[in-house]
A protein has these predicted regions:
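Hydrophobic alpha-helical transmembrane segments of ABC transporter permease domains
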Residues: 20, 73, 121-166, 247-258
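ABC-type nucleotide-binding domain
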Residues: 52, 329-564
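Short intracellular "coupling" helices and adjacent cytoplasmic loop segments at the cytosolic face
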Residues: 86, 94-118, 122-124, 198-221, ...
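Alpha-helical transmembrane segments of multi-pass membrane proteins
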Residues: 66-85, 132, 136-143, 164-188, ...
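An intracellular "coupling" helix at the cytosolic face of ABC transporter transmembrane type-1 domains
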Residues: 9-12, 105-106, 122-131, 135, ...
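Transmembrane helix-loop-helix hairpins at lipid-water interfaces of multipass membrane proteins
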Residues: 15-73, 153-158, 272
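Juxtamembrane loop-to-helix connectors within ABC transporter transmembrane domains
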Residues: 81, 99-145, 232
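Helix-loop-helix
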Residues: 46-47, 151-165, 239-307, 312-313
Length: 564
């Protein structure tokens, strides 16, 4: 099983180097105020300036050199950290995308597209921010706080105790308020995801929204989601706003208390240099604390996003291994269902003890009412889902023994609503076999399906970059036929192949099925009898079973056609 922890651990040595640099830089930053303290003590002494000139020059030189070294180390740390973080994020995004591509259809059917988009964009960016900026800042701040407390204990143990007690007070406050902040941030992210889902639904259903005049209802629902998001965000920042004054009050209280103790003579052996050192360390002590409070939101976002990416990667049960099984070079189209039963995600049964066979080279119509299970049978043939019981065989081989890569390589599936990739027309036809097709062969296929004239209207011909909006529904179906012909398989499955096509092109498609694919096994999901002229067999799906019909069962009633 792949998880986020394994990916991060691949970079552990690179990040250990960053941690080492953080510790060295923190040590240097702790040492710098001490140099200034020594300089102040030297200047304030009764010694003549000429006598301390050499020592003063040495202290200033040490300070400048140390500062320069610190700057160089900071540069190295930032460069290494940025490179490591970018490599890590690239690795996470690449691994996550591969994982999504390997999901089985059952997993996809239970997920929103916007959820996947959010995981691949916002969540991975949050992880990058968390690992590349927030976590190093917290580590640096934590190391520096410990070093400051150690040095302060040597300067004056009472001062160190005061700072430790104050730190405990601040930590308790942060944890108490932070618990609420974590809840508010989690709810805000969940609501934002719902809002993203709603955006996608809004744009997909825009025509329906206008047809039924429900713009106001949709608008109100958007306002409800936005208001809920605003409410959680406001509560989060209200809680966060309490932390800053708490930090400031604690800081000023400590400085005031220490100065008071010094002025009242409660602390022995305190000079101006020591007071500077103490005040400087207090400032430096609260600066990282302030950073930690200010970036507390990033911790919450990072933790939530890491959990969500881990959830997305899931377990191996969600994964479809297309290479598992026998690599069969050619399937001839002998398909047999034996006592097949199936239900989606253990829900209501769709098919029960289904039995039928399709022979090599047969043309078979798959008919039935909407929701009867026609598409389900096709999904099972394509290996998108595992059956609950029974057997499906191809040329006598069990479907589970054939690799999905081999299975799908031998089947062309023409969907009712084909997808057009944002790529060239040629790439949209050959998909993953571009090197084996000359331009002339692609043009011949376009002429065969009746799309050639359309393509000649494009400036770059078959190399024109197209997308979903470049073709009408009917033209998309013709493009899908071109894909199927280019794939050149032994089994073809058509989902209502002429539903979006005019009469002229409908006849073209029928000719292709009859002539071009005459030696192939053809399965046609059909709702109209005209679609399945010249088929050899009709399989009707009804009552979770498959009944074998003949073409004589197609009757004409009042110039309309229906299946019986």
């Amino acid at each position: 099983m792949i998880n986020l922890k394994k990916i991060i651990l691949k970079y552990k040595y690179k990040f250990l180097l960053v941690i080492l640099l953080i510790i060295i830089i923190s040590l240097i930053n702790t040492f710098l105020p001490y140099i200034i303290k020594q300089t102040i003590a030297l200047v304030k002494s009764d010694v003549v300036f000429h006598d301390i000139k050499q020592k003063l020059f040495s202290l200033v030189s040490v300070y400048l050199i140390t500062t320069l070294i610190c700057a160089i180390l900071e540069f190295l740390k930032s460069t290494i950290l940025a490179k490591n973080t970018q490599d890590l994020i690239y690795d996470i995004r690449k691994t996550t995308y591969k994982r999504i591509m390997d999901f089985n259809m059952d997993t996809f059917s239970n997920m929103h597209i916007s959820t996947l988009v959010t995981r691949m964009t916002s969540d991975i960016s949050n992880i990058g921010e968390f690992i590349g900026r927030t976590l190093p800042m917290f580590l640096s701040s934590g190391v520096f706080l410990i070093l400051v407390l150690i040095v302060m204990s040597f300067v004056n143990i009472y001062f160190a105790i005061i700072m430790i007690v104050s730190s405990i007070f601040l930590v308790v406050a942060v944890l108490k308020i932070g618990k609420k902040m974590a809840y508010y941030k989690k709810r805000e992210i969940e609501i934002t995801e719902n809002l993203n889902d709603y955006f996608g639904e809004t744009f997909s259903s825009i025509k329906t929204t206008h047809i039924f005049n429900i713009q106001n209802e949709r608008r109100q629902k958007f306002i409800d989601y936005s208001s809920a998001e605003l409410s959680m965000s406001t509560k989060y920042f209200d809680s966060q706003s309490i932390l800053t004054p708490v930090r400031s009050i604690t800081r000023y209280f400590i400085i005031s208390l220490i100065l008071y103790l010094c002025l009242q003579g409660k602390v022995a052996n305190i000079d101006i240099g020591v007071i500077y050192l103490v005040v400087s360390y207090i400032d430096k002590f609260f600066e990282p604390l302030g950073n930690m409070l200010y970036h507390y939101e990033d911790i919450q976002k990072g933790k939530i996003s890491m959990h969500r990416i881990d959830e997305l990667m899931g377990t191996d049960e969600n994964i479809e291994n297309i290479y598992q099984g026998e690599n069969t070079e050619k399937l001839y189209g002998n398909i047999k269902f034996s006592n097949v039963s199936f239900s989606y995600s253990n829900k209501k049964s769709i098919l029960e003890n289904v039995n039928f066979s399709i022979n090599e080279g047969e043309r078979v119509a798959l008919i039935g009412e909407t929701g009867a299970g026609k598409t389900t049978i096709v999904n099972l043939i394509l290996g998108f889902y595992k059956i609950n019981s029974g057997n499906i065989t191809f040329d006598g081989k069990n479907i589970d023994d054939i690799s999905l890569e081999s299975l799908r390589k031998n089947i062309s599936f023409i969907q009712q609503s084909p997808y057009v990739f944002n790529d060239t027309i040629k790439k949209n036809i050959v998909v993953n076999n571009e090197n084996n097709f000359s331009d002339e062969k692609i043009i011949d296929i376009l002429k065969l399906v009746g799309l050639y004239n359309k393509v000649t209207n494009f400036k770059n011909g078959i190399y024109e970059i197209v997308n979903e909006n470049s073709f009408s529904k009917g033209e998309k179906q013709l493009l899908a036929f071109a894909r199927a012909i280019a794939k050149d398989t032994s089994i073809y499955i058509f989902d209502e192949p002429t539903s979006n096509i005019d009469v002229k092109n409908e006849q073209t498609i029928k000719n292709i099925i009859s002539e071009v694919l005459k030696d192939s096994t053809v399965i046609i999901i059909a709702h109209r009898p005209a679609t399945i002229e010249n088929v050899d067999k009709i399989l009707k799906v009804q009552n979770k079973k498959v009944v074998i019909k003949s073409r004589k069962n197609i009757v004409h009633i009042n110039n309309s056609e229906k299946f019986t």
